[in-house]
A protein has these predicted regions:
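Active-site gating/metal-coordination segments in enzymes
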Residues: 18, 27-110, 114-123, 174
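Mid-to-C-terminal alpha-helical segments outside catalytic/metal-binding sites
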Residues: 1-18, 67-68, 186-193, 201-234
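Hydrophobic faces of well-ordered beta-strands that scaffold small-molecule active sites
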Residues: 19-22, 49-52, 76-80, 108-110, ...
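Active-site-adjacent C-terminal substructures of enzyme catalytic domains
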Residues: 140, 147-206, 212-218
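A general structural detector for well-ordered alpha-helical segments in enzyme core domains, enriched
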Residues: 7-11, 33-40, 65-69, 93-97, ...
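Conserved, mostly hydrophobic/aromatic
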Residues: 12, 37, 41, 69, ...
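Structural recognition of alpha->loop->beta junctions
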Residues: 71-76, 127-143, 161-167
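Helix C-cap/helix->beta junction micro-motif
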Residues: 15, 44, 103-104, 136-137, ...
C-alpha cells in the first residue's frame, strides 16, 4: 500500500525536516507518477520538493516531460532508477535526459552500488557515473545509496569531478563505511548529502548514532542540509 502524503508530511514536520520526494517510472509504467508528486508538493509545500521521472524508451517525450516538470511545476531534479530499466546511465537512451538536465540546470539523481531486489547490480557501478561526468561536465549528478560495495570507487569519482555528489539514502548512520565518513571529514565535506529512503528507513532511525560520526558543526550542517540546499537550489 502507498504511504499517504499526510503521513510523510507529518513525520517530517515533527522533526523539523524537509524532503525531496520522487516519482518512479519503470518499463511497466509509473509506480509513483509525476502528477502524484506534484499533488503532494502543492499540498505540503513546507515539507516537500519534487523530483520527476520519465519513460526512457521515449526520449523525445521524456524531454518534454522534464521541461514541463521543471519550468512549469517547479520540480528540482530528475531521478532515474537504472536497475528498473536494466540499463546503465551511460546508455544512449539517457543522453537526451542528461542534456536536458544541463540545459535546465537541475541535477540528475541516480542509484549507485548493489541492488536490494534480485536484479543485476551492474547498472550501479560508479564507472558509468564517470562516463557521463566526462561527457557532461556541467551536469550535476547525485549518486544515491553510497555505492557499496564500490563505495571507494564512488568516492574517487566524486573527488575527481566537481559536479558529482553522494547521498546516504537507504543507509543508517551505523552502516556508513569508514572511508565515507573520513571523506566527509576531509575534502568531501561539500560532496555528501543525508538521505533516508523513507518509508523504508524512518528519519529517526536514519539519524540514530549521528553524534558518533564526530563531524564538526560546519560539516554536520553541510551534510544534513547545506549541500542539498546548494545543489538542488532549495
Amino acid at each position: 500500500d502507498k504511504i499517504p502524503g499526510q503521513v510523510t508530511a507529518s513525520a517530517l514536520e515533527e522533526r523539523g525536516m524537509q524532503a525531496m520526494i520522487s516519482a518512479w517510472y519503470a518499463p511497466q509504467g509509473d509506480l509513483i507518477s509525476n502528477e502524484e508528486v506534484k499533488g503532494w508538493v502543492d499540498e505540503y509545500p513546507e515539507q516537500f520538493y519534487g523530483m520527476c521521472s520519465v519513460d526512457l524508451r521515449d526520449p523525445v517525450q521524456a524531454v518534454k516531460v522534464i521541461r514541463q516538470a521543471v519550468q512549469q511545476d517547479g520540480f528540482k531534479a530528475v531521478r532515474i532508477v537504472q536497475w528498473l530499466w536494466e540499463l546503465p546511465c551511460s546508455h544512449a537512451l539517457y543522453y537526451p535526459v542528461l542534456a536536458t538536465c544541463v540545459e535546465l540546470d537541475v541535477p540528475i539523481c541516480l542509484q549507485v552500488g548493489h541492488t536490494g531486489p534480485l536484479r543485476s547490480s551492474e547498472t550501479g557501478r560508479p564507472a558509468h557515473i564517470e562516463r557521463i561526468a566526462l561527457d557532461f561536465p556541467d551536469l550535476k549528478i547525485v549518486c544515491g545509496h553510497i555505492g557499496y560495495p564500490w563505495h571507494v570507487e564512488m568516492i574517487c569519482v566524486a573527488t575527481k569531478f566537481p559536479n558529482v555528489y553522494i547521498d546516504t539514502s537507504a543507509y543508517k548512520v551505523k552502516r556508513y563505511p569508514a572511508e565515507l565518513v573520513q571523506y566527509m571529514k576531509s575534502n568531501g565535506k561539500q560532496k555528501v548529502m543525508f538521505g533516508t529512503n523513507f518509508p523504508m528507513i524512518m528519519p529517526d532511525a536514519a539519524l540514530e548514532g549521528f553524534e558518533q560520526l564526530g563531524l564538526d558543526d560546519e560539516t554536520a550542517q553541510l551534510f544534513l542540509a547545506g549541500n542539498a540546499e546548494r545543489v538542488f537550489k532549495l
